[in-house]
Amino acid sequence: MRRFYRKPFSVPLLNRPHCSSQSHCLYKNGDFLSDDSKCSPLSSSRTSVRWVFNSSSLPPPEWIEPFNDVSDLVKSNRNLLPSPWVSQILNLLDGSASMESNLDGFCRKFLIKLSPNFVSFVLKSDEIREKPDIAWSFFCWSRKQKKYTHNLECYVSLVDVLALAKDVDRIRFVSSEIKKFEFPMTVSAANALIKSFGKLGMVEELLWVWRKMKENGIEPTLYTYNFLMNGLVSAMFVDSAERVFEVMESGRIKPDIVTYNTMIKGYCKAGQTQKAMEKLRDMETRGHEADKITYMTMIQACYADSDFGSCVALYQEMDEKGIQVPPHAFSLVIGGLCKEGKLNEGYTVFENMIRKGSKPNVAIYTVLIDGYAKSGSVEDAIRLLHRMIDEGFKPDVVTYSVVVNGLCKNGRVEEALDYFHTCRFDGLAINSMFYSSLIDGLGKAGRVDEAERLFEEMSEKGCTRDSYCYNALIDAFTKHRKVDEAIALFKRMEEEEGCDQTVYTYTILLSGMFKEHRNEEALKLWDMMIDKGITPTAACFRALSTGLCLSGKVARACKILDELAPMGVILDAACEDMINTLCKAGRIKEACKLADGITERGREVPGRIRTVMINALRKVGKADLAMKLMHSKIGIGYERMGSVKRRVKFTTLLETCFDS
């Protein structure tokens, strides 16, 4: 039988790419093949390969939308499933170097172009929201399509993605594009932009959107107001946020709990905790119940102000109202009570937390352990550490470091070293605070060589040596009369390590130099400190004045004290410290001269100075003189004769007493 073959006919393919260099190509199992000499049409009967001839003029690419048009099938377009094109485009957005060329090839192959609505929808998708670089590349690629222009929603969607990544530079560029094209503002776009700009505190862009809303007759919603205020507060424009709040109070849209929380947060950030507290009470009088966020914001602000009493009061309010107290709030309240030395109250809050079903974390245990350790109750701190471990919590390096610090301050260095080795065994990274506590403890125990080895070990382990570590070792050197080593370490501190020499560093070294009678070197060190602009503390001047007074240079100490006054440094207790030092050294006459100097400057001598002098006289066997000074009419450097107040010098009284 004769076998007939039907001649294939040419059909334009609407969803296949055009072969530019060939008049025809091979199509096999859904794929296109190149036409070359190795491909023979005779093999088509056995391999299901057929010739397909393309038309010389393909139809134009079709714009695709994120949802299929089913308006003729359903009445409502809500809850529509995305078009299959969406998932295919998302699969191509892989961030690779060939991503854009893959997108080009795909669109050519299927004769499609992505509409602005499609681009906006893809940018909003969960797959892209946390990939700002891919979103940016896709946005830039899509605008290269022929006859394509981004709409406002595309820009808004991109800003939202970039805001999550806090990419302010790109957001500013996109914002300038929006302004340039003068899109008419919509409610949804305005709200989204205000939210994004507000998160980043971009006030200029925020106010531009606000003006565009007014120009387009868009009425702000409560949502809009809240995000506007949040943006102003984030940028520390608290006064502006306050004015917006006042507009809301007098307008149609009233503040809600979010508005109040934002305003309270603004006051707290600006350090106006009292105004924040007033706003909290005002909120309650207007029928708005404070929530967990309100109280948490206030507790954090009060803790930062060291107003621990208010922290406790706010916590008690939360407890009474049945508001869930977050772990961080418990940590702050317990920490505040511990800092005030109210360890029993802190422990009560801790137990109350557990009783109410809240599980403590490592941070809360650490706060309480630190409180016990700093108060000298090291045994209680260790017991709490063991309880923490028994309950399944693993102490971190901070927990161990506060225990070690407490042990070292109580002279229990061996136990501290045991915990140090435990941390190493557990693979915990020892921090500089941990090392400085051990170095200080070893130094005070006279184990200076071990302290020095530990100091050098820090560098080997890659642990940064801060001023606390240097100060601990310098203090160890000076206390054991190794002043030269202390001076060498002091120089190395700045020259090699670039570590700041603090006023405490100078205080330690000054004290050590004076103890070794290296007075001139100490004075040069003092001058160096002043030249560097480091303000001396009372302790620092005490180290200097004590050294000078004991070496008979009281006038020099007084002169230096006078030089500090123009610098704005007023050390009220400085003269008292010097008098105390002289009295302890038995130099009563010099102490009296110094007391007279106080009255000559127009200041009254505190009664406690007379007490110091009386005690000094009694200790050197001048009990009769001490009694006369105690019962004399001189109170604080003055003698009263009826209504007349006459200045009396201490030296005169002293000479009179000696003469009698």
From Swiss-Prot:
User: Which stretches are PPR repeats?
Assistant: 151-185, 186-220, 221-255, 256-290, 291-325, 326-360, 361-395, 396-430, 431-465, 466-496, 502-536, 537-571, 574-605, 606-640
For this UniProt record, the keywords arranged alphabetically read as follows: Mitochondrion, Repeat, Transit peptide
The organelle targeting sequence, given as a residue range: 1-12
Pfam families this protein is in? Answer: PPR, PPR_1, PPR_2
Gene Ontology CC terms, in alphabetical order = mitochondrion
Record's SUPFAM superfamilies? TPR-like (SSF48452)
NCBIfam families for the chain: PPR (TIGR00756)
Name of the protein this chain belongs to = Pentatricopeptide repeat-containing protein At1g03560, mitochondrial
Species assigned in the record:
Arabidopsis thaliana
